[in-house]
């Protein structure tokens, strides 16, 4: 039994580096332009969904959270616009078809408690991903202003994540 247990432990331990690489790949290195594209799309989607929460959500906490996200991500988009412009990077000004189909369209069909549940889940997942990417950009951006922008945006994203987790637990 001991040799079997030892072998099993060796197999599990030898797979941990691969698992760590997979997690690290989620926040893979991006060019500054790719980060601007990601951040702008994220801001526009979050602001749009936040506004939608005002009419489609059933609980007041979800509506309030959506209103906060709409305001915060609109402000963040404007800050990103200024930084991108100074860095001579292109700034998307509309949600692209891919993000519309993946993020906006599914919510158009939901109302009430179903909207609330799906919104909370997506906000936890989305903010978890965004935080990893922003941390990477805050450390590795080529442009100093973009690096600073990413670092300054992190506390707001982290608050959004914690609030979304609270909404998810309440459902």
Regions found by a protein language model. Give the residues of each.
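His/Met- and acidic-residue-enriched segments that coordinate or traffic transition-metal cofactors
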Residues: 2-6, 12-171
């Amino acid at each position: 039994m001991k040799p079997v247990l030892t072998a099993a432990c060796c197999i599990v331990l030898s797979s941990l580096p691969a698992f760590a690489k997979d997690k690290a790949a989620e926040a893979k290195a991006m060019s500054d332009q790719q980060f601007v594209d990601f951040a702008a799309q994220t801001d526009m989607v979050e602001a749009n969904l936040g506004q939608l929460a005002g009419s489609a959500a059933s609980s007041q906490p979800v509506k309030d959270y959506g209103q906060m996200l709409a305001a915060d991500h609109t402000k963040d988009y404007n800050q990103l616009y200024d930084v991108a412009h100074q860095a001579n990077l292109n700034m998307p000004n509309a949600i692209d078809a891919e993000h519309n189909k993946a993020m906006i369209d599914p919510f158009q069909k939901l109302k009430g408690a179903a909207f609330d549940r799906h919104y909370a889940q997506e906000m936890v997942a989305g903010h978890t991903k965004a935080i990893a990417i922003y941390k990477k950009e805050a450390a590795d951006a080529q442009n100093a202003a973009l690096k600073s922008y990413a670092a300054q945006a992190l506390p707001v994203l982290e608050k959004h994540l914690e609030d979304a987790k609270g909404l998810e637990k309440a459902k």
